[in-house]
Amino acid sequence: DEKNKLMSLLSKHGAILFRGFPITGYMHFDSFIKTFGLTNFPYEESFSNAVRYKRTKRVFTANEAPPSVSIFLHHELAQTPVYPSHLFFYCENAPEKNGETPLCRSDVLLSKLQGVIPEFVQSCEKLGVCYANVMPDHEDNKSGQGRSWYSTLGVSNKLNAERKLNTLG
């Protein structure tokens, strides 16, 4: 079964890169993702504030910031309490210049950090990590994280935003 072979390779290597794979558009990509039988992840529930457009219930654009905005290496959806078990990336429109999707295995990075700066790793394990995310009160499509807190939280006012955030702890 090809699906099981791919999932085994994914587990072993952390990522699979398909080059020249015959995907002809986002609908075809959606069908490809569906064959894996994974639980669908609704982006709307993620609390990510990147501006993305929904193509299908499984496919969203990566980020609608202009090409001049640098988006640095980051853990996808790390700042959110709800996240998918797997991520699939597909390039529908290649940029005219530059354009990269760097991948980094967190387990490998952690192992290297433990070898180079173990005191830092121990400090993080002891103290934990806290994310602060300041969101605008209006949409800003010129930013890599330009969804407003209204849109990100799916609310219409501050009171409902506070209620929603309080349910998350």
Regions found by a protein language model. Name each.
Residues 1-169:
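Non-heme Fe(II) oxygenase catalytic core, chiefly the N-lobe of the double-stranded beta-helix
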